[in-house]
């Protein structure tokens, strides 16, 4: 599994960036930490609709019920957004993912204010897809 920061550390690192260019570079760097997605997972079933870029997300429960998240995108900034989302959900069960509202975290970063409308819609589509996958396991 990718080495992603815990949400609190992610927020601290984000706050240390001097401007939005640095924040974007940090998000892109987080995306580079994601494990490669196997080609067989790049299929229509795992493709997230509602994203301008191609985004694939795969969820797999482990033996303790924790959801393991895998994802990729053909756009560097979107791949970074996937990593940010995964850092919020890492280590959680399907029930915890369904119950967790991550929107306040994104609001605290003011990220949506600096994303294009299509990127914001794509981010929402990713969140909905992960929650739907988690809910289907309950």
Swiss-Prot record:
GO terms for biological process: iron-sulfur cluster assembly; sulfur compound metabolic process. Its main location: cytoplasm. It is found in: Cytoplasm. One of its GO terms (cellular component) is cytoplasm. Signal peptide: none annotated. Keywords: Cytoplasm. The keyword Cytoplasm applies. InterPro entries: Cysteine_desulfuration_SufE, Fe-S_metab-assoc_dom. Pathway: Cofactor biosynthesis; iron-sulfur cluster biosynthesis. The active site is at 51 (cysteine persulfide intermediate). Belongs to the SufE family. Participates in cysteine desulfuration mediated by SufS. Cysteine desulfuration mobilizes sulfur from L-cysteine to yield L-alanine and constitutes an essential step in sulfur metabolism for biosynthesis of a variety of sulfur-containing biomolecules. Functions as a sulfur acceptor for SufS, by mediating the direct transfer of the sulfur atom from the S-sulfanylcysteine of SufS, an intermediate product of cysteine desulfuration process. HAMAP family: SufE. Homodimer. Interacts with SufS. This is Cysteine desulfuration protein SufE. It comes from Pectobacterium atrosepticum (strain SCRI 1043 / ATCC BAA-672) (Erwinia carotovora subsp. atroseptica). The lineage of its organism: Bacteria, Pseudomonadati, Pseudomonadota, Gammaproteobacteria, Enterobacterales.
């Amino acid at each position: 599994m990718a080495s992603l920061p815990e949400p609190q550390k992610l927020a601290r690192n984000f706050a240390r960036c001097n401007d939005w260019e640095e924040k974007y570079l940090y998000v892109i760097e987080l995306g580079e930490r994601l494990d490669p997605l196997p080609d067989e997972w790049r299929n229509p079933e795992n493709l997230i609709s509602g994203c301008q870029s191609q985004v694939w997300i795969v969820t797999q429960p482990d033996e303790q019920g924790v959801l393991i998240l895998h994802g990729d995108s053909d756009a560097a900034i979107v791949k970074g957004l996937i990593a940010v989302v995964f850092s919020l959900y890492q280590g959680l069960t399907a029930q915890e993912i369904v119950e967790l509202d991550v929107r306040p975290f994104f609001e605290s970063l003011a990220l949506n204010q600096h994303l294009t409308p299509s990127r914001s819609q794509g981010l929402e589509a990713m969140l909905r897809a992960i929650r739907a996958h988690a809910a289907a396991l309950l």
